[in-house]
Amino acid sequence: MLDKYSPAEIESKHYQNWEEQGYFQPDMDLTKPSFSIQLPPPNVTGTLHMGHAFNQTIMDGLTRYYRMKGCNTAWIPGTDHAGIATQIVVERQLAAQNVSRHDLGREKFLEKVWEWKEVSGGTITQQMRRVGCSADWTREYFTMDDVRAETVTEVFVRLYEQGLIYRGKRLVNWDPVLGTAVSDLEVESVEEQGSMWHIRYPLADNPAEAVIVATTRPETLLGDVAVAVNPEDERYTHLIGKELILPLTGRTIPVIADEYVEKDFGTGCVKITPAHDFNDYEVGKRHDTRLVNVFDLEAKVLANAEVFNFKGEAQPSFALPEKYAGLDRFAARKQMVADLQEQGFLVEIKAHTLMTPKGDRTGSVIEPMLTSQWFVAMSATPNGGEPDSEFKGLSLADKAKKAVDSGAVRFIPENWVNTYNQWMNNIQDWCISRQLWWGHQIPAWYDNEGNVYVARNQEEAEKQAGKTGLTREEDVLDTWFSSALVPFSTLGWPSETDELKAFLPSNVLVTGYEIIFFWVARMIMMTTHFTGKVPFKDVYIHGIVRDHEGKKMSKSEGNVIDPVDLIDGIDLEKLLVKRTTGLRKPETAPKVEEASRKLFPEGIPSMGADALRFTMASYASLGRSVNFDFKRAEGYRNFCNKIWNATNFVLMNTENQDCGYGATATEPRGYSFPDMWIVDRLNQTIEQVTQAYETYRFDLAAETLYSFMWNDYCDWYLELAKVQLQTGCASRQRATRHTLLRVLEAALRLLHPIIPFITEELWQTVAPMCDAKTADSIMLARFPEADSGEIVQTAFEQMTVLQDLIGAVRNLRGEMGIQPNVKAPLFVESTDDLADYLKYLPMMTRLTEAQQVATLPESEDAPVAVCNGARLMLKVEIDKATETARLSKEAEKLQKALDKLNAKLSKPGYTEKAPAHLVEKDKADLAELEDKMAKVQTQLSKLKD
């Protein structure tokens, strides 16, 4: 007998043993097929969230499956240095001590960051172990460790030497609080209620006439270089080429024609500010205007404008109105609007809903800023230095396109190819520099004249310059730069290693759609460029895990479920503290608490990692977002418990018994049709689950395994086995014991990739009993293979008859409202021989007996059903008056519920205005009530006949 199922106890025991024994490591036998997978490196600052648990369940399931298929498997884990996120964490710690990074200086500050990383940076990888991830921890990397640092430098220098990296002045997303450029992924668009200011721009040659420009950013007016109109807009064609007076400045700017302007939007006139708007930048580039920068890096108004052409060359500067100099952009907005009003330029102010770009770390409004940055050229062709391959000579963007167009890289689901191509066809050069201290410092040095020397180290740079005293570039690289190299930086490149031969390309990348461009495309570019190979064969795109209402999980919204809390459990008060801390809107705390109490009235009970994993697998349909339902996780905790209890039953009935196993044992004879049927179902399940794993359909694998174990094995076969073990002859009992063990052991191996802990625990006991202990761990045992030769069609047909008979008896009992504790005899009228079936019926349908008769006995009260040509009758004694009263009371109760629900659904506007999921639930409840009412009425009519 096994002890009570305790996930915590078995999980800690087995994971530690797996890791200590080195089971996660590949044996590097290059004659074996390989399976490798890269972990999207989570931020070193991070903790495990539901998206990680979802993503890692899929990756670990694949790794365990292919390991059991005999592959040389390598799942390579690592963490990302997360430049901005990590620097913010440490800066906040220093701020609590009234110290800034500038007080410490760069070197001392970086020492503090490394100290923090060593103490706190491993949280997420420890949590990955809690989920059961069988990653090869001996290969764990950090994107700023020494090996990755050397690779980053080598790649940067080679790209520079090939003419693919350059320094230039471009418009970037600028976070004024952080003081750095940020990527598009680090910018959130937040819907806000703002204003649209309508401003008069008078004609220079006739100030009485003016065009009206509508803008949401009047503070950038100082940097305007033109006003654009649509060339087809007849209202303004006569003005094209004329000069306008720029309000508040006295400067004049031209009216230009550009198809970017929508005739029907606003006034049809758009101010063009190329140094402070991405769309305006493109318009200005087409018309070769100047770029007039009016803000410093803190987003304060400059005293003198910085003026450049589109080659980045400085142009003559000019003074900005003195009264605005030094003002923050929003203070400047307020003052300028007042001045526009006073001077008669402000026509009107309209309320306007707009999407404001904000830094995801600071919440500050992002400012498009013209700065000097380092870029990787996406469309330029390299000037040599590439490995021979089909990608040689192509630009980085064309390499990435070719990899997908040729089928070398496959997207699953396929529709994501369209998204990928859309991004690639509109690609811009990649801004790779960041004005931070934490990160890979760019390997470039400057002399006093501003000449730049890119080199692997300072000594090499000084050799290039022919002098000493060079100053190193202070900027660091975008975090995505080092992340883009992990497919080969983790395998020994630039050396030709066995790991590169065995594991590049990897088999699949499992990731979310939001980083297809930021990470997936860049890995394809870099890997094809430097190795001539694609980084991976398949890209499996999964959906986002949302809360039960379909909202994105966010700590700031108070709707996050911590996967570790699902594994370990958490009491209600601690859960409420977690959910109401750090809210974006603290005033919503009571509402968050109320919702949490309703959803988790007693907190979250311990589910265990296996239940969490099975839940995630069940959600893993291709590409769809997931609305996480806590009840489903509870159901799969019960599923694990069902497997545990089923194993207990099998052990109770097989230990110290002759089960037909052992060195001298002979094959059992006398298998019953239920024995043969469950083996049939096992083989069918093996085929279906194998297909599901190999096509990334973990949802189908989970559904198939659940149905087989719960319905076929536990609900049907174990119940039939009880009859056979109690009533069968010795050979029949031996065959049943043999089948119980055989099917259970194979099922545990089938289940292992999804629920590894419970299957390991049970397999260690079950496998030796059926000669299946072929390895020290279930993860090293072979995955089951289907034997189509074992499928017996007659067994399937016989089982169908038995299931129909049992179903008919259960329906009879239900129709007559016979209580579960009441037993009654069953009579079956049929010309067929039903002896093989009838012996199972009493135990499975609570009968006193089941017998076959030539003619059903006379009984006016007994219900009769027809099943497969046989007529079935339950002989029951019924007190008509009592039963009629009971059913009438039940009918009255059902009618009240029906009337109430019908009234709700008939209420004008309800079905149109109420949330769709509530309407669907009401309709489903109505159908269920109507079905119950029909059955009650049927029983009443029978009693009245």
Swiss-Prot record:
Coiled coil feature spans: 879-945
Keywords, alphabetical: Aminoacyl-tRNA synthetase, ATP-binding, Coiled coil, Cytoplasm, Ligase, Nucleotide-binding, Protein biosynthesis
Presence of the UniProt keyword Magnesium in the record: no
GO molecular function: aminoacyl-tRNA deacylase activity; ATP binding; valine-tRNA ligase activity
Annotated localization: Cytoplasm
EC numbers: 6.1.1.9
Annotated function: Catalyzes the attachment of valine to tRNA(Val). As ValRS can inadvertently accommodate and process structurally similar amino acids such as threonine, to avoid such errors, it has a 'posttransfer' editing activity that hydrolyzes mischarged Thr-tRNA(Val) in a tRNA-dependent manner.
Family matches, as Pfam families: Anticodon_1, tRNA-synt_1, Val_tRNA-synt_C
Gene3D superfamilies per record: HUPs (3.40.50.620), Isoleucyl-tRNA Synthetase, Domain 1 (1.10.730.10), Valyl-tRNA synthetase, C-terminal domain (1.10.287.380)
Binding, ATP: K555
The protein, known as: Valine--tRNA ligase
GO cellular component terms, semicolon-separated: cytosol
Family designation: Belongs to the class-I aminoacyl-tRNA synthetase family. ValS type 1 subfamily.
'KMSKS' region (motif): residue ranges: 552-556
InterPro entries with a match to the protein in the record: aa-tRNA-synth_I_CS, aa-tRNA-synth_Ia, Anticodon_Ia_Val, M/V/L/I-tRNA-synth_anticd-bd, Rossmann-like_a/b/a_fold, tRNA-bd_arm, tRNAsynth_Ia_anticodon-bd, Val-tRNA_synth_C_sf
Domain notes: ValRS has two distinct active sites: one for aminoacylation and one for editing. The misactivated threonine is translocated from the active site to the editing site. The C-terminal coiled-coil domain is crucial for aminoacylation activity.
CDD domains with a match to the protein in the record: Anticodon_Ia_Val, ValRS_core
Subunit field text: Monomer.
HAMAP family attached to this UniProt entry: Val_tRNA_synth_type1 (MF_02004)
Chain positions of motif 'HIGH' region: 42-52
Catalytic reactions of this protein: tRNA(Val) + L-valine + ATP = L-valyl-tRNA(Val) + AMP + diphosphate
Record-annotated membrane-spanning stretches: none
GO BP field: valyl-tRNA aminoacylation
